[in-house]
Structure formats: structure tokens, C-alpha cells
């Protein structure tokens, strides 16, 4: 699909469809008023008649509006003008795109990016509208034999901004959105793959393919034999019961100077998590293919990064493994020696993600990173705490926390910081090893982060728990593509700071 931005009056636009807003109660937006004027009150007559109230979710599709150059006019309900929220804005865009895609209009000019959202500018409006459009049009039908084809799908969408002065910001928003949307799609496609196809080996093959596509990405694969030589025994224990061996995929993006320390993104890549010997309930176990959502988001962020050609160095790691029960699988009661030399008593084999990540977090010390961010569908406790709308952020480093929260706010890919006070560490005590792999039910997300923190002492580190945000259940089941937008914004901000430092 083709996107563009422009600045112009609605009455001068010649297109298959022009989209304008209607506010409650029955009041046209500025662009709507301009169309109403040239149509000699045609639109306002419809409003007075009650054809559309302006409530969010309402649409009115019109053909042959008098004196309007465009073939069609789509009136979209935008709610109360002064109370419009960010979430409502994205809902309005989604409703617009769904309607347009069903009408047979091949192109459209949209004036909804002119809507006022408190604290947001044109850059944000265009970026969010573009990302929401791509999300709305996403469909994963790779394995369907009877595919549903839209009669005449929307092929071109132009966002109109209020003045020419806003064009530069709008174009930047569009550029960033297209990169993020491309990364989010890559994340969704990878996460939605069935686990009989998306194995740890498959993850490594996708990482290699990404490196072949982008000149600045070099991919390195660490297989199980190499992990054994590195004494990554905690990681390997998780994969022991599976017929699919573990693979750790490292994507090195070299966009900065050779002496610039890399940012490291680590994604938990459990391509299927049965729980192991501590077997999960059968209900919804199919969704445990999404336990590689962290790795999928790192993969997507690396693609977005490469498309934006940012001047920084980043290493994206996909920590691939599969957790299955078997006669040789690891057990509750086992004591594992991690790559760091610290020992862990396994109390629950379904708390496996941290056992994979702890060895990867030790492995990345060799890169002397600027910072490390791990992304993982780590705990059900995070869903209990924050639901399905907000990712959990945990870090002992205030500066990095502020950066990630700022990126969250800028991208509207929400995260919330949870505490990591020393008192929580006591819950991980074991009478037989240096620590246990779980700390009991209370504050489960926090104690999981505390566990990981014991392997990150040599660098600045943060943990994103995306257990509640990486995928949706129910009728619209599927990967959300999160937190690709947050991660990409974090990297954009870092690159801008790097450029400023170089030029100062």
C-alpha cells in the first residue's frame, strides 16, 4: 500500500474518496465545513436530518456530493472534539480504514490527521494513523486454502495536514511509521507461525535471511554444541526435553562508528512452551507458540532499524529454545550451574524463560554494551498486574527507565515501571543453591526481574515483560507486533542523541 502526505483544501481534492470528521452533536470538522460550503449545505442538511450524530464508530458513505471533485465522501464520527483521546483517535482511524477497504475505493485523501489530540502534534497524528492503518489491514492467512480477498482493496492513502509548515513533521512521522509498521508486520508474521514450523532453527534461518537482505546486518548463530562449550548449561537444560535443539541468533547492526558501544536487545524465543515437567493446563496451550514474542519483537525492531538506517550499533539476539516434557527433560529439584557460575534450584520448569535469559545476559558481557534491554513474555503475574494494554518495565537504572518510558509515551506503545527493591530478592533464596528460579506467588513479575538482575551487574540493563501485550486471545487471536514501536522509538532517540553528540 502507498502512503503520502500533503497540505491542501478539501474542495480542491480529486480522489476516489475524501474523508472528513463529524463531531458530536452533529457538527462538521473544519474540512467538513469547507466541503459543506461548496456543496451548498448538502452535508449540514444530512446532519440536521440525523443521518449521522458524530459518535465514534459511526460512518456515512456518500456518492456524488454536489460540486465536490472527489467521487465519494466518507463522514466519520469523531466523538466530542475537546475530549478526543489517543485511543479514540486510533479507533477512528481503524473504523475509517475498514470502511474504505470495503467500499471499493482504491485511493483516499484523509483529513482526520488534522484532529486535535491534547499534547500531540502532526508528527504523532500521521505516524499513529499510518501504524493503525497497517495494523488494521494486517491479515495472516498463510495456511488458509480458501483466502478471503477484498473486492478492490485500498491501495493509496494520503494524509492531509493543516498547513505547509507541518509537512516536514508529517513526512518524518510517515517515514518512521512505515519502518515501524514493516517491523511490526515481521514480528507478527514470525509470532503467528505454528510451532511445528517456527522452531529455534527456523528463528535462526529468519535471522540469517534478515542479514542477507540488509547490508549493515551481520548474523551469527550459536548452536547447542557451542553453547555447551560456553557452559550455557541453564539455557541448554530448558531445551533438553525437546527434539528441536536450541539456537541463539545474533544480528549485529553496524550503523555507528567502530568504537561506539552497542545497544543490545535480547528476546526470549521459546517457540513453544508446554511448561515442561511442570506441564501447563491444556486450555489455551496453543497460545504458548507466542512465548517467543520477545524474540519476534527484537526481530521486528532490527528490521525497522535497518530500514531507517540509523547511525548506531545494535545487537539483536533471538534466544531460541523449546520447553517440552520428556524422559531426559530437566525436573523440579534439579540444580543448574549457569554460565556465570551461579547455581539455580529449579522449583518449577514452567519458569523457564529466566533460565534461558540468564545465560544470554551473561554471554552479552563480551560486547561491553552501552546498555541491554531484554524483552520477554515472562510472567502471568504481569498480566494480573497490568492487564493486556501495558507492558511491565523493571530496571534498577533510573536513566534507562526514563528513556524507555519516554519512548513508550512518544510511540503510544505503553509501558509502566514496577519497583525492584532489595526486599524482593529474599523471595529467591534457596537452601540448596545460590537462588531458586521462582520466588512464590507474591510480586511474581518483580521477583522474575530480580532473578535476571543477578546476571546483569556489569552493565546498564532493563527488562520488559510483555506477557500481556505481545498477543491477543479470543476471536481476534494473533500477535500484536508489540513492543516493536517502543523499541524502535528508543533506538531513534538514541540515534538522535548520538548525532547531536557527534555534531556538538
UniProtKB/Swiss-Prot annotation:
Q: Which residues form the active site?
A: 280, 354
Return the EC number: 3.4.11.1, 3.4.11.10
Primary site of residence: cytoplasm
GO cellular component terms listed in the entry, alphabetical order:
cytoplasm
Disulfide topology: none
Localization per Swiss-Prot or TrEMBL? Cytoplasm
Cofactor binding remark: Binds 2 manganese ions per subunit.
Its recorded reaction(s) are: Release of an N-terminal amino acid, Xaa-|-Yaa-, in which Xaa is preferably Leu, but may be other amino acids including Pro although not Arg or Lys, and Yaa may be Pro. Amino acid amides and methyl esters are also readily hydrolyzed, but rates on arylamides are exceedingly low; Release of an N-terminal amino acid, preferentially leucine, but not glutamic or aspartic acids
Name the coenzymes or cofactors required.
Mn(2+)
Sorted alphabetically, the Gene Ontology BP terms of this entry are: proteolysis
List of residues binding Mn(2+) 1:
273, 350, 352
Residues that bind Mn(2+) 2: 268, 273, 291, 352
Q: Which Gene3D superfamilies match?
A: Leucine Aminopeptidase, subunit E, domain 1, Zn peptidases
Q: Which CDD domains match?
A: Peptidase_M17
Q: Which UniProt keywords apply?
A: Aminopeptidase, Cytoplasm, Hydrolase, Manganese, Metal-binding, Protease
The organism's superkingdom is given as: Bacteria
GO molecular function (one): manganese ion binding
| Function text | Presumably involved in the processing and regular turnover of intracellular proteins. Catalyzes the removal of unsubstituted N-terminal amino acids from various peptides.
Q: Which family does it belong to?
A: Belongs to the peptidase M17 family.
- Designated name of the protein: Probable cytosol aminopeptidase
